[in-house]
């Protein structure tokens, strides 16, 4: 079932490393303190993959749990909440992640994991949810425009990285988010949220055998033949020292 298994021991933490049938690298650390499981899937799908549609990765990830072909956002939220599970997504300039935290008892874990797998394989991005999330995102961007720390951070990255994909804020710009279509989102999901673009980390009180079974289910849900990985963008960045000043009105 598993292509390779190695063990790494450091500071009393034992980490098992192996690959699923379709080649996803999995790291597992056993923790017997609490009967829980933490699953984190990391993708090479940060905002550096946005291309001309700035904010695309973050918008896509924020919509993953807003609907599948058979469930609406309310039902998805209810499944996680009623089983005490937490679903979360995160996007930075380099990477994105999709995670699940659940109790390990079967009556809680099974429905939570089933919902998690459905999101990975079948997010549908309903038009009404896309439009609503775009409005929320634009409101956040507008609010950030009056936040000195956000302004300073955006200026810093723009000055340092120029036209490199790292230069724009991961959330995007109001005008760019406004132009993002459902098709843009679906295409990004299909091209980037896939088995060849993923790695999995799991911390749990479950046995290695049980974790392997879960990893294989995740791997299978991400294995969609039509998905493809985009070649990593690389660009030389010249090192330079600059001081960036921005005046703020105290009124």
Give the positions of each predicted feature.
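Boundary at the C-terminal end of the N-terminal hydrophobic targeting segment
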Residues: 9-13
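Solvent-exposed, polar/charged alpha-helical surfaces in well-ordered, non-transmembrane soluble domains
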Residues: 62, 74, 78, 110-114, ...
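Acidic/histidine-enriched alpha-helical segments
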Residues: 77-78, 123-142, 207, 226-240
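An aromatic/glycine/proline-enriched structural segment found at the starts
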Residues: 162, 167-170, 175, 199-251
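Short acidic/His-enriched helical or mixed secondary-structure segments at domain edges of catalytic enzymes
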Residues: 136-154, 234-251
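M16 family metallopeptidases and their MPP-like homologs
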Residues: 27-29, 34-59, 73-120, 150-175, ...
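Scaffold signal of the M16-like zinc-metallopeptidase fold and its non-catalytic homologs
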Residues: 66, 144-195, 215, 248
């Amino acid at each position: 079932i598993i292509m390779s298994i190695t063990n790494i021991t450091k500071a009393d933490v034992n980490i098992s490393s192996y690959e699923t049938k379709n080649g996803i690298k999995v790291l597992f650390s056993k923790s017997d303190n609490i009967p829980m499981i933490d699953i984190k899937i990391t993708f090479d799908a940060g905002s550096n993959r946005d291309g001309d549609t700035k904010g695309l990765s973050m918008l896509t990830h924020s919509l993953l749990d807003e609907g599948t072909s058979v469930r609406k956002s309310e039902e998805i939220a209810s499944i996680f909440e009623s089983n005490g599970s937490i679903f979360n997504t995160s996007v930075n300039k380099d990477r994105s992640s999709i995670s699940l935290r659940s109790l390990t008892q079967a009556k809680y874990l099974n429905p939570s994991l089933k919902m998690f797998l459905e999101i990975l394989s079948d997010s549908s991005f309903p038009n009404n949810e896309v439009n609503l999330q775009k409005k929320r995102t634009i409101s956040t961007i507008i609010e950030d425009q009056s936040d000195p720390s956000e302004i300073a951070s955006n200026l810093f990255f723009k000055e340092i990285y120029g036209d490199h994909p790292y230069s724009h804020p991961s959330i995007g710009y109001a005008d760019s988010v406004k132009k993002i279509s459902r098709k843009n989102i679906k295409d990004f999901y299909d091209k980037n949220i896939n088995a060849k673009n993923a790695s999995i980390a799991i911390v749990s009180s479950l046995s290695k055998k049980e974790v392997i079974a879960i990893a294989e289910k995740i791997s299978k849900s991400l294995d969609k033949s039509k998905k493809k990985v985009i070649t990593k963008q690389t660009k030389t960045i010249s090192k330079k020292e600059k001081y960036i000043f921005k005046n703020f009105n105290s009124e």
